[in-house]
C-alpha cells in the first residue's frame, strides 16, 4: 500500500464492474478477494458494489446490500479501524436502494459516504472520484496532529 495513506480498498464481483471503474481511476488500490481474506495496514476509503435491491423501502438492518466478502473484511477489527470513507456503486433500477451499500457501511462504521455511481461509472464519475479522493486525503492530512504540535 501507498505509504502516504491515500489508499483505496475495493470489492468487485465476477461481473468486474467495480474493478473496471477502479482501473480507470489509475490510483493505488487493494482488492478484497472473492475467496480468502486480507488485512490492511493503512487508512483507506472503501469502494464497493451494492447487492440486492428492489425492496419496497430501504432498511439498513435488512441485510443483503453489502457483499459477504466486504462484511468479513470489515468484521476484522483492525481493518474496520482504518476505514475513513466509503464510495458505492449501484443500479438506478433499485430506486431508493441505489448504491445503498454505501449507506449501510457509512452508518455502521461511522464514516462519510463520499460518492455513489451507477454500474461501471461514467468518465464524469471517474473524474469526480479521483478529484474527490485527492481532496479528501488532503483534508485528512491537515486534520492529523503532528508530533511537533503535541
From Swiss-Prot:
Q: Which InterPro entries match?
A: Flavoprotein-like_sf, RNR_Ib_NrdI_bac, RNR_NrdI
Which domain of life, per UniProt? Answer: Bacteria
Which Pfam family, just one, is annotated for this protein?
A: Flavodoxin_NdrI
In alphabetical order, the GO MF annotations are:
FMN binding
Q: Single Gene Ontology BP term? A: protein modification process
By its UniProt entry, which PANTHER family does this protein fall under? PROTEIN NRDI
Concerning its family, UniProt says: Belongs to the NrdI family.
Cite the HAMAP family for this sequence.
Answer: NrdI
Job of this protein:
Probably involved in ribonucleotide reductase function.
Q: What is this protein called?
A: Protein NrdI
Q: What organism is recorded for this protein?
A: Mycolicibacterium paratuberculosis (strain ATCC BAA-968 / K-10) (Mycobacterium paratuberculosis)
Amino acid at each position: 500500500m501507498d505509504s502516504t495513506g491515500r489508499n483505496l480498498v475495493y470489492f468487485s464481483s465476477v461481473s468486474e464492474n467495480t474493478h473496471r471503474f477502479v482501473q480507470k481511476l489509475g490510483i493505488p488500490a487493494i482488492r478484497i478477494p472473492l475467496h480468502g481474506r486480507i488485512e490492511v495496514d493503512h487508512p483507506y476509503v472503501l469502494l464497493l458494489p451494492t447487492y440486492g435491491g428492489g425492496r419496497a423501502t430501504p432498511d439498513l438492518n435488512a441485510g443483503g446490500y453489502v457483499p459477504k466478502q466486504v462484511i468479513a473484511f470489515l468484521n476484522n477489527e483492525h481493518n474496520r479501524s482504518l476505514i475513513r470513507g466509503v464510495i458505492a456503486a449501484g443500479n438506478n433500477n433499485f430506486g431508493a436502494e441505489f448504491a445503498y451499500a454505501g449507506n449501510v457501511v457509512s452508518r455502521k462504521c461511522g464514516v462519510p459516504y463520499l460518492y455513489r455511481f451507477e454500474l461501471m461509472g461514467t468518465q464524469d464519475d471517474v473524474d469526480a472520484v479521483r478529484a474527490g479522493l485527492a481532496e479528501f486525503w488532503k483534508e485528512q492530512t491537515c486534520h492529523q496532529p503532528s508530533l511537533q504540535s503535541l
